[in-house]
Amino acid sequence: TKDKFVDVAGACAAESSTGTWTKVYDGKGSGVPMADKMKAVAFDLEPETNTFKIAYKVDLFELDNMSGLLAGVVGNIGGMKMLKAFRCLDIRFPRKMVQAFPGPQFGIDGIREQMGIERGPLLLTVPKPKVGRTAQEQADLARILFTAANGEYQGIKDDENLTSLPFNKFEDRCKAVLEVQKEIEEKSGKKKFYLCNVTHSNMETMLDRAGMIKAYGGRWMMMDVVATGFSAVHTMRLKNPGLAIHAHRAMHALMTRESGPGVYDKGVIFDFSMSMVAVAKIMRLLGVDSFHGGAPKAKMEDYGEAKLIRDVLELDITPETS
């Protein structure tokens, strides 16, 4: 019913800001007066599409703390019994919060300047099978790709689960491919790039791997940003030795997939999720330079979001999703 929908919207606003499930003491020292000032407000309620928006006071959050913000705005909502399903379609960040995050070190303009390519696509291949080649075989393939199309092909990329394996150690692969990159660049006079996967659950290991890439002459690193986590992305942006960051979204579907028919349509959803639009925006704020955002009509479900994701990654001011 409409009344129940209104109750749910209000409960989501309360739970994601200063509300709680029980009556609390409101006397001296209780914090209730400030909590009342900081409470969120649900607005633009649309029962026909089961959508609503929530507005938060900026002072409710630490400006440069993405993990803290997400613990608030989407932290507990999905677990509420009164909700049958929920999807966070978008998060609109205020200017002062956007400016508090590092953002991409290079971005589109910086990457084009780095590569000496003002217009047109940057072309690279992700070798298949995902794993199976040795480090030397990976380097041999890189040579083929770096010289393809009369030298107009730019790069090669590790896949998400190619890390440091018994038959393909990270340092061996990094060194071998980047030696080929250097050789081809010197011969052709054209810049190439290798997206070398530093993914690890230990931050120190990822930073060490980034250091190896820099030492061997690389310009890029790749990391599985969902699997490693928001704090890992933020830290790698701040502490990596001047490398551009490519973000692979492996594991995202456990956050973003929705099996209902109503995403961006009739509001009928079955699951609890966050859109890839929101995830992409978060990753851009945290500092990735390029993002594996998916493509329309490809093997991964995109719910028609591909253009929205592109806008989030390219535009200075992103359009509001409906």
What do these predicted regions represent?
Residues 127-129, 160, 196-200, 223-225, ...:
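A cross-domain feature marking catalytic cores of carbohydrate-active enzymes
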Residues 173, 177, 185-194, 198-214, ...:
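N-terminal active-site wall of soluble small-molecule enzyme domains
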Residues 207-210, 216-322:
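Catalytic alpha/beta core domains of metabolic enzymes, predominantly
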